[in-house]
Swiss-Prot record:
Pfam families xrefs: NucS_C, NucS_N
Annotated keywords: Cytoplasm, DNA-binding, Endonuclease, Hydrolase, Nuclease
Taxonomic lineage from the root: Bacteria, Bacillati, Actinomycetota, Actinomycetes, Bifidobacteriales
Signal peptide: none
Role noted for this protein: Cleaves both 3' and 5' ssDNA extremities of branched DNA structures.
Family, as annotated: Belongs to the NucS endonuclease family.
EC number(s) stated in the UniProt entry for this protein: 3.1.-.-
GO cellular component: cytoplasm
Subcellular location: Cytoplasm
Residue ranges of the region described as Disordered: 62-97
Protein name: Endonuclease NucS
Biological source species: Bifidobacterium longum (strain NCC 2705)
Amino acid sequence: MRVIVADCSAEYSGRLNASLPLAKRVLLIKADSSLLIFSELGSYKPLNWMTAPCTIREIDPAAKSAQHSRESVAGGAVDGDSATHSPESVAAGEPEKVLRVSADKGSDILEVTLQHIYSDQTYDLGEDPGLIKDGVEDHLQRYLAEQIERIGKGAKLVRREYPTAIGPVDIMAVNAEGEHVAVEIKRHGGIDGVEQLTRYCELLNRDPLLAPVHGIFAAQTITPQAQVLAKDRGFTCLILDYDDMKGTEDDSLRLF
């Protein structure tokens, strides 16, 4: 990973045209040659970037300036010294580097002019193990299966990922009365999740060996619209407290 801190400007051309005026910014250049430009404030997203596959080259600023001069003279736009230096470039002086990044699959070009470089360092970050997500639906499913009485006292687990013709139900259990309960689990429960649970329950209730099958819609958060729809369909909503399920002291359970 190459990290450059510099006063820079940038021009992007291709599918769209965009420019960044001269300012102090951070540039990240990855091993795949992708380049990202960041500012101090604003979004976590870069101001401009070129992603792989791409090719990056360092252009000699003097050669670029000379080429620009020849093109200006050939075009008859201006003559003399004014052809080579605008008032802004005279004030700023010659840039230290020019980076040109070209898309390998297209005509897009990002050209970054580094007017003054404060730092230019390269680091070997090694192989990254990747992001390990905590609190995803699979974790919620596993914890709820291990603590199945959260859906009701006396409940027993039948199995996780209970197979059906239209896809697996997250959890199938039986309640204290011995009736089957299908549990659909989401991190953030919306109307789509309730509709999914509805399809499962309608299918499962056609099987005389399983019916009646009740439905529980379980999530860390459930939208008000989803709560209303679930209640209308005869389902129970269960709010899952992930920290609690991992073993924190608060063992409260909210059913509504």
